[in-house]
């Protein structure tokens, strides 16, 4: 009898733990977390400015502001990835409820790659003048003075003009532009590149269990040139297997790694990326890493 009672109690404890674990997993699965950021980014929460960090949880009502040459990546549950681009301000209206996820782009641009939303899931991105609703797609929504744009790379987006209530379905390769009237055009090459990049970034399974370095190692190689700017000098040296010495006409010497050439050279140094006009460069020397 005693053995039977112990078994029943143990079974009850296991059931409670399993239920708690299930609820915890469900709660964790709905979290929105920072997976990467670069430059000047701040999270405005309850009137205070909070510095972002990888694995930081984003809450409903938070406003994220990215400065020039800056951006931030968010992962919502395991269903979507969002990139808030430079010079943008985006409010997290409702991200914790899978049935009604919503962003408000106050200015700038938000790129979204929606993987899965579930049977009753919904995701909406708004500006002051339009609403874009999706179930699964790669798209961007931008807000500038007197203009809102929705660009679609994959899937379809239902766009509604708030003032008139009129709607339009925007398909792959198309962009909906609203000023004082609505128009449709082909997505630009720049828009397509942006969306291709956000589409390549995965929704990381078990994100909450990953270390910051593990997340960084997953995301960084997928960011292209913007990822290089976020790397340390040692990481860039390892990537390119060299050190560059740049000698200027005014006698200055810059040591680092040249990460792009053209009318203006971009050079990764110990203090970050510096830009130097080509006409100011006397010559360069390359030292391969051993």
Give residue spans per PLM region.
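Bacterial N-terminal signal peptides that target proteins for export
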Residues: 2-12
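Flexible, surface-exposed loop/linker segments and immediately adjacent secondary-structure boundaries
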Residues: 25-63, 67-69, 74-242
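Conserved RNA-binding domains used in RNP assembly and mRNA/RNA metabolism
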Residues: 224-290
């Amino acid at each position: 009898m005693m053995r039977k009672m112990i078994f029943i109690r143990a079974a009850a404890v296991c059931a409670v733990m399993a239920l708690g674990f299930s609820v915890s997993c469900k709660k964790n699965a709905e979290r929105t977390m920072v997976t990467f950021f670069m430059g000047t980014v701040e999270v405005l929460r309850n009137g205070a400015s909070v510095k972002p960090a990888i694995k930081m949880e984003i809450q409903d009502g938070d406003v994220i502001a990215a400065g020039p040459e800056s951006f931030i990546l968010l992962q919502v549950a395991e269903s979507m990835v969002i990139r808030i681009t430079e010079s943008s301000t985006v409010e997290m209206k409702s991200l914790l409820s899978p049935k009604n996820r919503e962003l408000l782009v106050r200015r700038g641009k938000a790129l979204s790659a929606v993987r899965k939303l579930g049977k009753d899931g919904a995701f909406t991105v708004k500006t002051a003048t339009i609403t874009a609703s999706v179930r699964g797609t790669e798209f961007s929504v931008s807000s500038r003075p007197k203009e809102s744009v929705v660009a679609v790379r994959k899937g379809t987006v239902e766009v509604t003009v708030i003032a008139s209530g009129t709607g339009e379905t925007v398909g792959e390769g198309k962009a909906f532009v609203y000023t004082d009237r609505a128009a449709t055009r082909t997505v630009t090459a720049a828009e397509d590149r942006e969306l291709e990049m956000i589409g390549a970034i995965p929704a990381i399974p078990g994100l909450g269990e990953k270390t910051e370095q593990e997340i960084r190692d997953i995301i960084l190689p997928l960011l292209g040139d913007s990822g290089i700017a976020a790397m340390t000098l040692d990481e860039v040296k390892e990537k390119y297997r060299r050190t560059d010495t740049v000698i200027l006409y005014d006698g200055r010497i810059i040591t680092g790694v040249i990460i792009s050439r053209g009318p203006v050279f971009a050079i990764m140094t110990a203090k970050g990326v510096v830009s130097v006009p080509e006409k100011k460069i006397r010559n360069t020397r390359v030292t391969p890493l051993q």
